[in-house]
Amino acid sequence: MKSYIEPFIASKALSQNSQKAYRYDLQQFCQLIGERVNQDKLLLYQNSIANLSLSAKKRKLSTANQFLYYLYQIKYLNSYFRLTDTMKVMRTEKQQAAIINTDIFYQKTPFVWGQLISLLILELGLTPSEVAGIEVANLDLNFQMLTLKTKKGVRVLPLSQILIPFLEQQLVGKEAYLFEHRGIPFSRQWFFNHLKTFVRSIGYEGLTAQKLREQFILKEKLAGKSIIELSDILGLKSPVTLEKYYKS
């Protein structure tokens, strides 16, 4: 990709000083991106310039975007990529959460509601609101699929074999939602209370829905999922919030 820097600069009417600035910025850009452009690498570049002054950041973004468009025009790139200055870059935490042993989450318990809530988060990476919105009609246990409909769109998620018995048990007598009373979904506080009671009963007091979801993220990353793949699974608009898990 570096070999296209000079033809790109030559295609623009630039002063000598501007040419030097373009050349410097693009050499840095190509050094980080390499020969293959993808969203993950662009996010890394976004991070690398995050602490620059606003004017310097805008200059580098503008230069990189012009170069990306040029590469797309000459068909070096099959897709058009664009960096934006509105992307929020997450700071890397010094200590990432560790993967916990979740075997105890699957053992028999009297707190079956809280158990199923926690398993749906652990197994599928759902948020509490997504768990609350699971409709009976969108659960296909024969084909082991959940169709999740939210304001962000529709996602089809595979259900693991180990999750099926827990779902079968709680589907009995349900009219509209997996978690309901006479067809009306339970409140947000209801979910919070049942989850809190269950995790406390198995010795994980303080383990929140957010931390359970983080366990899903860590396991999927360990399984080899890319940041883009994981972002799609979670239904995120952007993978930016996942960056901290992909930094070494």
Curated annotation (Swiss-Prot):
Protein name: Tyrosine recombinase XerD-like
A GO term for molecular function: DNA binding
Family statement drawn from the similarity comment of this UniProt entry: Belongs to the 'phage' integrase family. XerD-like subfamily.
Entries under Gene3D superfamilies matching the protein: 1.10.150.130, Intergrase catalytic core (1.10.443.10)
Transmembrane portions of the chain: none
Keywords annotated in UniProt: Cytoplasm, DNA integration, DNA recombination, DNA-binding
SUPFAM superfamilies: DNA breaking-rejoining enzymes
Protein's GO biological process: DNA transposition
Listed GO CC annotations: cytoplasm
The keyword DNA-binding appears for this protein: yes
All copies of domain Tyr recombinase, residue ranges: 85-248
Subcellular location per the Swiss-Prot or TrEMBL entry: Cytoplasm
Described function: Putative tyrosine recombinase. Not involved in the cutting and rejoining of the recombining DNA molecules on dif(SL) site.
